[in-house]
Regions:
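ATP-dependent carboxylate/phosphate-activation module, predominantly the ATP-grasp catalytic core
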Residues: 1-5
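Charged, low-complexity surface patches
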Residues: 6, 439, 589
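Acidic, glycine-rich flexible loop/linker segments
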Residues: 10-20, 24-25, 33-49, 549-564, ...
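Contiguous hydrophobic, helix-prone segments at protein termini
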Residues: 19-25, 48, 53, 76, ...
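Short intrinsically disordered coil segments
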Residues: 53-59
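Low-complexity, flexible helical/coil segments
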Residues: 59-67, 74-79, 122-128, 132, ...
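Protease-associated
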Residues: 60, 66-79, 490-577
Length: 637
């Protein structure tokens, strides 16, 4: 039996071990001659870590995973987290260089403190409902957290309600665009004007950055642009929000005005949307595939060479490759700043490492018919146009007379606005990634200078510091400051600690929702009406398909053959060229309006998302049936 003093001593030892490894440890100990001995320590992998700032707090708080919202659940580097914290506008003080206090790190991921939003009843209902569209299990998890005894009462009694006035700058910036977007009789020129304005803005940022002399000055300028980026895209959001509202309103009005079932037509209207920047990127990827089909020697060279940046440059020497490279260079000019898991600024872009892109192009060149991607998209566009006319005619005929004519005009306007503005859904992230690319290049340039002074051992050291730390280091570089050995040693120790922690959490699955007391809600789907043994998720693109599963966790290492069903942990724009070959898509995370879901609908392929652990439950080669209409996957053999 241990005495109280011995228990205190043992707890102190356990805390020292936890502090040393920076994560909770399962320890084995021995007691000999009144002295404790540590025999073994290993991480407690069943516990998800809480940030230091949450520990000891008595108030009730609820946090949601930013990674699940962005459909990228891998760890995010310290630099990546700090950049996102500077960008994330809601709740951040309007002071330069201040990180957002509503964002906190847990397990090398970012979590959003949504507690302030939950204090207002109307926001609480809207927010949890909206979250289900982003990730159903996340929204349900928040609902379950609020149902825990004393949680909502605790939030309402301790948390200050957010001031409505804090939303005024956003309302002021977005409202004119909303009004103009809805009232205009020519939505396409309105859309083109918004896109042109964003192109001009990003070009000016790049030009202004190049005109600044000091590294510190450039980093501060880019930080200012990052912090104010949301105000630059408010006109874009001003026409996108009405499109999202119109989407549900179209369905509601059809149900109210029309007797017949028009579900197929409604689904067709959401497909073949011209102007979506990601769809355009995918189509141009298909064009590159067509060029490569005419150059079998170049395709074979890519496959044999490992498809790295060096092989890409050597391929230019092959006879006849000029046509491919002319188109490839144009593609990289528009999309080279995209990449896998791109919300972490640490991760390489296609222009740094084209392997994932070349992998997709060379695989498609073997299986895709020439021009098939363009023909498929044309058919989707044509069917969408026909569906628009069918819906309008049905609305007119259902009421008849003047009422029918009036309703059909309203429906036509709603459909036109939806199909014109909805393609802008991907543009905000496209331009944010363009800004990230400019910042990334500056950080790497500064890291190279720090390598020359032996402060950094490699340029990738920069990713394990925070942005404001780099601003301070850049100021010292500009002034010719001589770094002292102890100073360098301390800095490198901090970098090593950040790197070690990042690597340690790579294989840890982050929860969708966290409560401040460490509780993790684990909601589930209803199995009513679902076949026994089926994997239940959320149907986001209608249709039923049977086929061979292909589990892909890294598009740079694995490829999808024509007609296979893609099983993925998550998808971002760098993944979607794979959708060209996919018969259906199944993803571990996501909701109705997340990236993969929208692209699946536009391509007209069935999709089910938000199935936790599906990349483990389904193995490559397994014969499965995907029901995108009802939201489940059946294992057939």
């Amino acid at each position: 039996m241990l005495s109280d003093d011995q228990i205190t001593e043992l707890c102190t030892l356990a805390l020292r071990v936890e502090d040393h490894y920076e994560t909770p440890q399962d320890i084995e100990w021995g007691l000999e001659g009144g002295k404790f001995y540590l025999l073994q320590a290993r991480p407690i992998t069943t516990l998800y870590p809480l940030p230091e700032s949450w520990r000891g707090r008595k108030d009730h708080r609820i946090y949601i995973s930013l990674g699940h919202i962005q459909v990228m659940t891998s760890p995010v580097s310290p630099m990546g987290r700090s950049v996102l914290s500077l960008f994330f506008p809601f709740g951040r003080p309007r002071k330069p260089g201040v990180y957002n206090p509503l964002l906190a790190e847990a397990g090398e991921r970012l979590y959003i403190d949504i507690t302030p939003v939950l204090t207002r009843k109307f926001l609480r209902k809207k927010y949890t409902g909206g979250m289900k569209g982003v990730d159903f299990l996340m929204g349900k998890g928040v609902e379950e957290a609020l149902e825990e005894p004393g949680v909502l009462e605790g939030i309402l009694s301790t948390e200050k309600k957010p001031k409505i006035a804090s939303a005024f700058p956003y309302i002021k910036g977005i409202l004119p665009s909303v009004v103009k977007g809805i009232l205009t009789s020519k939505p396409l020129p309105r859309r083109e004007k918004i896109v042109s304005g964003l192109e001009t803005y990003l070009s000016s940022v790049e030009e202004n950055t190049g005109g600044l002399k000091g590294a510190e000055e450039r980093l501060i300028y880019l930080r200012d642009e990052l912090e104010n980026f949301v105000f630059k895209v408010l006109p874009l959001l001003g026409v996108l929000f009405p499109a999202l509202i119109i989407r549900s309103k179209i369905r509601g009005k059809i149900q109210e005005w029309v007797d017949s079932d028009l579900d197929e037509e409604i689904q067709a209207v959401e497909r073949g949307l011209e102007g979506n920047i990601t769809t355009q990127m995918d189509l141009e990827t298909g064009d590159l595939t067509d060029r490569l089909k005419d150059l079998p020697m170049l395709a074979a060279f890519f496959k044999e060479s490992g498809m790295d940046i060096g092989a890409l440059e050597k391929g230019r020497l092959l006879k006849g490759s000029e046509t491919f490279y002319r188109e490839f260079d144009r593609f990289m000019e528009h999309y080279g700043f995209r990449g896998l898991s791109e919300i972490d600024i640490k991760n390489e872009r296609w222009k740094d490492d084209p392997k994932a892109l070349l992998q997709i192009i060379t695989t498609h060149a073997e299986s895709e018919e020439k021009g098939a991607h363009r023909a498929h998209f044309y058919q989707l566009t044509k069917k969408a146009e026909e569906a628009v006319e069918t819906i309008i005619l049905s609305v007119r005929n259902s009421a008849g007379g003047r009422k029918g004519v009036s309703r059909s005009r309203k429906m036509r306007k709603m459909l036109n606005l939806f199909r014109c503005y909805m393609p802008l859904r991907e543009h905000g992230k496209y331009y944010l990634m363009k800004l990230f690319s400019i910042i990334r290049e500056e950080l790497l340039d500064d890291a190279e200078q720090l390598c020359k002074t032996s402060v950094f051992r490699g340029t990738d050291d920069v990713w394990f510091l925070e942005y404001n730390e780099m601003v301070a280091l850049a100021g010292k570089l500009d002034s010719g400051y001589v770094f002292q050995p102890e100073e360098i040693k301390d800095l490198q120790k901090r970098i090593d600690s950040g790197r070690s922690r990042f690597e340690r959490f790579c294989d840890v699955e982050p929860p969708r929702v966290l409560m401040g007391n460490g509780t993790i809600p684990r909601p589930s789907y209803s199995s009513e009406g679902i076949p026994e043994g089926a994997l239940i998720g959320m149907g986001v693109s209608a249709g039923v398909v049977e086929g061979r599963a292909r589990v892909i966790t890294d598009p740079g290492e694995e490829s999808l053959l024509k007609g296979e069903i893609l099983i993925a942990p998550f998808t971002d724009p760098a993944w979607t060229p794979l959708f060209i070959n996919a018969a259906a898509v199944v993803i571990e995370v996501g909701g109705t309006m997340t990236h993969g879901s929208v692209i699946a609908r536009e391509y007209g392929i069935p999709a089910v998302v938000s199935i936790p652990g599906v990349t483990e439950s389904v193995k490559t080669g397994r014969h499965i049936r995907v029901n995108g209409s009802r939201g489940f996957v059946e294992l057939l053999d």
